[in-house]
Amino acid sequence: NESVSYTFEKPDKAEDLYSKGLKAKQSDSADTEVVTNTIAPIVTSITSNTPKEDGESSVKYTKKADKTEWYSGNIEFNISAKDSSDNKHHTGIKSVTATFNGTDVSKKLKGLPVFTAEKVESVNDITFNTEGLNLNEGTNTVEVTVVNNSGMSSTKKYEVYVDTIKPEVSQFEFKTVKSDVDKILSFLTFGIYNNEKIQVTVSAYDVNNAENAKSGIDYLEENHAEIQLYSAENQGKITAGEYSYNDDGVLSRTFTLACGKNEFNKYMLTAKAWDNVHNKSESYTFEKPDKAE
């Protein structure tokens, strides 16, 4: 026995395919027309920033040259997606998933709607942060995949960079302020100038990671690159000067010390440096010897 033929009619509007289903009509023909949406959904944006609840524990720096984003700690990502680049053809989003450095973090996504409750054409401000996840020193990769109710999908990749390596103070250079005796002094000869002003130039550099990359030490704004010089008993007699930065990635800053005879013997100098994401160097302390050699 042969059944009668059934033909599926394409609905007038694309959204009817999802909301109302396919309509069947009896026909004498054996032909069947099946309608489906082959336009893939898209991840419209992935952005990153320091987590709001993280306070000052993570610092962000964006390099001007290549626009790479560097962090010293945890990162928060913001995701947006929509069902189709063509606003007239939507079957609705079925799922949004994400990985971080290859690890599925979909359960960490905040702000997702219940996709089975209604047809969702777009999602915005979907967030997750890296708390509890392993951060790579250097490149860290987020991949977001969106799938619609027609089974079409697309994936977008986004990279950020992490620098947790401390910079290093590489040099102390001592000079007298007087131009007629403007020779470079080693720290051991520092003691012969016990009644003059002394200029101390402290140099520091950021350390490369395994990828031969770093956030750098050239961005001189608050909470970024910095060099400071300290004296426990004579801090008020240290005047901080200007910075200089060279092509080798070395940042220098010159300080002037008021070396009166009485307080000079008490000078013990400590320098610290911060890179562009404010990793702090070890403290480097130099104490004036009892006598010049």
Segments predicted by a language model, with ranges:
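Low-complexity, disordered linker/stalk regions enriched in Pro/Thr/Ser/Gly
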Residues: 1-293
